[in-house]
Amino acid sequence: AGELAVADTGAANDIYDKMIAQKANFPEGLKWTNDNYYGWKGGIYSGGFGCAAFAFAVSDAASGDARATIHHDYNNIRVGDILRVENDTHSVIVLEVKQDSVIVAEGNYNSSIHWGRELQKADLADNGSYIMTRY
């Protein structure tokens, strides 16, 4: 089991590095609204606008054309996962997983790109929320 954990950590670090590299394309404060569209390679949706467009673009940069799956296990959130939150109204992508919270990047947050907001895990799960993972 130890080898799997090490391999998983390596994959998470690689995904993190690829996501952070996207700051060059999507700098903090860049205007980003529902006018922005991105076609996604993850397979669940063909693409999205606004917050989903940003999450999908960063996800593709990190995971290529790996297929995504949906789950609702909030104890199994991983770096690079896309969280659909706030009763299915906002998408964020996970940069870091802590014991009780996650650090995310997001588009269309106050009409712009934002890196580094902390969300409490206890606030993530609601009736409309889910997790898209590409692991």
Q: Positions of the model-derived regions?
A:
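Compositionally biased amphipathic helical and low-complexity segments enriched in hydrophobic
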Residues: 5, 31, 94-96, 120, ...
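Residues within well-formed alpha-helices
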Residues: 54, 91, 126-128
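Alpha-helix initiation/capping motif
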Residues: 47-51, 73, 120-125
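...with weaker cross-activation on analogous glycine-rich loops/strands in unrelated enzymes
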Residues: 56, 60-114
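N-terminal capping segments
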Residues: 1-60
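Active-site signature of cysteine proteases
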Residues: 99-135
